[in-house]
């Protein structure tokens, strides 16, 4: 089965986890940014997982170097453009790129300039390639609550202009949603859609709380609902889509293999799962690679993929016009 030629949708892709290694090197040389190595093969070890990762926290260490080269308007625009260029080459027709603006203020940019630069890169790529993109703003859970309010407030002016949603990301502690009730209440009032990283690192109850306390419309990962019957039931009853990222989950040691990943069980039980990369560079993956692995190890069929694709269309925060366009590609999903 040729998964490369199939139309695809990406709903969970971090900008700072999906840079070209060549671009990191190029910007570092141009801007005099120190790197542990200027040899591409050696640098890859610092920004990609090489089967040496034992946890989500270790996985997140791979973002340190990419963020060093994402501190100017020019670089942010370039990196966003290149991401859409890369996924368009993988036949992705729609992508929701996510990033945390406050990770890019080291050289004096303000939040508005940061968001604007990424949107410019997305829009430039849309003009050249057969792809549409939107932006999800991330609030870092390892920063204080006022910083989350700041992102919500300052990003609101871009809603309807490319920004579609708010997210909570970074390391996952038990019962984190309770701290963010007021932040997400404000986000909803501003008009953001809501997706929350939860149930990625062993705490299924976080998914329950993200939906009940934070009004999450989608869940990033959500795989540990398998260990929380109440969360599983709620996700199924409310048709809450899960942004599943299998290879990333293996890298963070949430699961030992594709065969033991609960994705196929969720799909067969009617859970609205979607397949995503999480971080193309960190996990050295693409949507095509994800599908090939699921086909090889879990028996993913073309019929299964059609369900996944339509799940992603409906789960997306795209406009009704874009959703209609995405549905038109269903006829191309054949074995």
From Swiss-Prot:
> Which positions bind Zn(2+)?
12, 14, 197, 278
Q: Name one Pfam family in it.
A: A_deaminase
Q: Where is the signal peptide?
A: none
Cofactor, free-text remark: Binds 1 zinc ion per subunit.
| Binding-site positions, substrate | 14, 16
Annotated Gene Ontology cellular components are: cytosol
Name-wise, this protein is Adenosine deaminase
Task: Provide the organism lineage as a comma list.
Answer: Bacteria, Bacillati, Bacillota, Clostridia, Eubacteriales
């Amino acid at each position: 089965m040729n998964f490369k030629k199939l139309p695809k949708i990406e709903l969970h892709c971090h900008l700072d986890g999906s840079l070209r290694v060549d671009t990191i090197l190029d910007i570092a040389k141009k801007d005099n940014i120190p790197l542990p190595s200027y040899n591409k093969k050696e640098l890859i070890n610092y920004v990609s997982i090489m089967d040496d990762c034992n946890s989500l926290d270790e996985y997140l260490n791979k973002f340190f170097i990419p963020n060093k080269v994402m501190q100017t308007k020019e670089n942010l625009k370039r990196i966003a453009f290149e991401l859409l260029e890369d996924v368009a080459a993988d036949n992705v027709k729609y992508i929701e790129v996510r990033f945390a603006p406050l990770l890019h203020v080291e050289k004096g940019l303000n939040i508005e300039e940061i968001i604007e630069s990424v949107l410019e890169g997305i829009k430039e790529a849309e003009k050249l390639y057969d792809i549409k993109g939107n932006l999800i703003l991330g609030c870092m859970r390892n920063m204080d609550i006022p910083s989350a309010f700041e992102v919500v407030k300052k990003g609101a002016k871009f809603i309807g202009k490319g920004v579609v949603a708010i997210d909570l990301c970074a390391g996952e502690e038990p019962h984190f949603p309770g701290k963010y009730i007021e932040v997400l209440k404000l986000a909803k009032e501003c008009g953001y859609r809501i997706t929350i990283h939860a149930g990625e690192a062993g705490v299924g109850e976080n998914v329950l709380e993200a939906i009940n306390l934070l009004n999450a419309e989608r869940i990033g990962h959500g795989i540990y609902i398998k260990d929380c019957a109440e969360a599983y039931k709620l996700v199924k009853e409310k048709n809450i889509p899960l942004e599943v990222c299998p290879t990333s989950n293996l890298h963070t040691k949430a699961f030992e293999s594709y065969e033991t990943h609960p994705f196929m069980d969720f799909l067969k039980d009617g859970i609205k799962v979607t397949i995503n990369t999480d971080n193309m560079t960190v996990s050295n993956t693409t949507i095509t690679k994800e599908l090939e692995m699921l086909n090889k190890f879990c028996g993913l069929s073309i019929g299964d993929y059609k369900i996944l694709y339509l799940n992603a269309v409906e789960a997306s925060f795209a406009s009704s016009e874009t959703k209609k366009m995405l549905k038109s590609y269903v006829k191309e999903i054949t074995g």
